[in-house]
Amino acid sequence: MHQIDVKILDNRLRETPPHYATPGSAGLDLRACIEAPLHVEPGQTTLVPTGMAIHLADPGLAAMILPRSGLGHKHGIVLGNLVGLIDSDYQGELMVSVWNRGHASFTLNPLDRIAQLIIVPVLQVGFNIVDDFDASHRGEGGFGSTGKA
């Protein structure tokens, strides 16, 4: 198992530090480290602190902040940037861009779970500039070009 450095910036997280909920969990819950309830109106986007910072320190890794499925499906609360990408050399506090795409005001309470953090492998590549590609079956076929499911 990889180990990464985590800096707890909000002491309330020391009681319940980020952890995998089950052995099969891919993501760790990120919490809203706010002092008072925060009302997010329809169409509003706001940055919410998570009370923690990470330093992956390995260019072969990156972190991704993803939405929690229940918040999006039940309340229309998703990430304002859709996915947050955290580079291996970033060391600042993790912030979550919360967007209310729903039709009703939503209240975030202190320490509510607002997003998930996953760690993913990264492959940096070099580019070989070419004039043409070798032919493939798909070619330039794009959106919907492979037929119906």
UniProtKB/Swiss-Prot annotation:
It comes from Dechloromonas aromatica (strain RCB). Keywords: Hydrolase, Magnesium, Metal-binding, Nucleotide metabolism. It catalyses: dUTP + H2O = dUMP + diphosphate + H(+). The keyword Magnesium applies. Gene3D superfamilies: 2.70.40.10. Belongs to the dUTPase family. Substrate binds at R68, S69, G70, N81, L85, I86, D87, M95. HAMAP family: dUTPase_bact. The keyword Disulfide bond does not apply. NCBIfam families: dut (TIGR00576), PRK00601.1 (NF001862). This enzyme is involved in nucleotide metabolism: it produces dUMP, the immediate precursor of thymidine nucleotides and it decreases the intracellular concentration of dUTP so that uracil cannot be incorporated into DNA. Signal peptide: none annotated. GO terms for biological process: dUMP biosynthetic process; dUTP catabolic process. Its EC number is 3.6.1.23. Its cofactor is Mg(2+). Pathway: Pyrimidine metabolism; dUMP biosynthesis; dUMP from dCTP (dUTP route): step 2/2. This is Deoxyuridine 5'-triphosphate nucleotidohydrolase. CDD domains: trimeric_dUTPase (cd07557). One of its GO terms (molecular function) is magnesium ion binding.
